[in-house]
UniProtKB/Swiss-Prot annotation:
Keywords: Cytoplasm, Methyltransferase, rRNA processing, S-adenosyl-L-methionine, Transferase. The keyword Endoplasmic reticulum does not apply. GO terms for cellular component: cytosol. NCBIfam families: rsmG_gidB. It is an enzyme of class 2 (transferase). This is Ribosomal RNA small subunit methyltransferase G. Its main location: cytoplasm. The gene is rsmG. Specifically methylates the N7 position of guanine in position 527 of 16S rRNA. The keyword DNA damage does not apply. The lineage of its organism: Bacteria, Pseudomonadati, Pseudomonadota, Betaproteobacteria, Rhodocyclales. It comes from Aromatoleum aromaticum (strain DSM 19018 / LMG 30748 / EbN1) (Azoarcus sp. (strain EbN1)).
Amino acid sequence: MSAATLEQGLAELGLHLSPATQARLAAFATLLQKWNRVYNLTSIRDAGQVVTHHLLDSLAVLPHLEGITTLADVGSGGGLPGIPLALAAPDCHPALAVTSIETVNKKASFQQQAKIELGLANFTVVNERVENVRPEAKFDAVISRAFSELLDFVGLTAHLLRPGGRFLAMKGVYPRDEIARLPAGFRVVEVHPLTVPGLGAERHLIILERN
């Protein structure tokens, strides 16, 4: 993995992360590639693309997490975006704690190992189907890159949120048709086009709330 690519990408995103944090992000990328050879955590195997498509894509949402202290990452697979966000949090959002909810055992096992190896005190792994999770304290927000349909995202995760909590959907092209299919009781409150360095594709962060 190119540390220079990561450093340049962070600068283009306007993120000022310490050298120690950048080193931990690089260590996570190495760990992801190592486990991916056996566990098939991601289809992306090129080291440079791991930086752009996974690390920088995940971190592009950081400026939009103001006011959020508890964040649930649903269906994060290899820990994306949850682990990069947890790694960067001490430099940008010191109060942020991330909980990853992952159904697949091998993916949850990888995330737990990453937590241990990277010393992530602000990251928790829950190996369970999202609909079965009943948190003691509900979350400020829930985020996901995994859902192909906003309808499913809000339907399966609404019970995780505190009153006034937000859904953060990381999408590619603007999901006009998906928004039109949202059930009554949910609305889009913010749309943020994201420019991810090195990723030649549209990205949007769609923020939703209950009415």
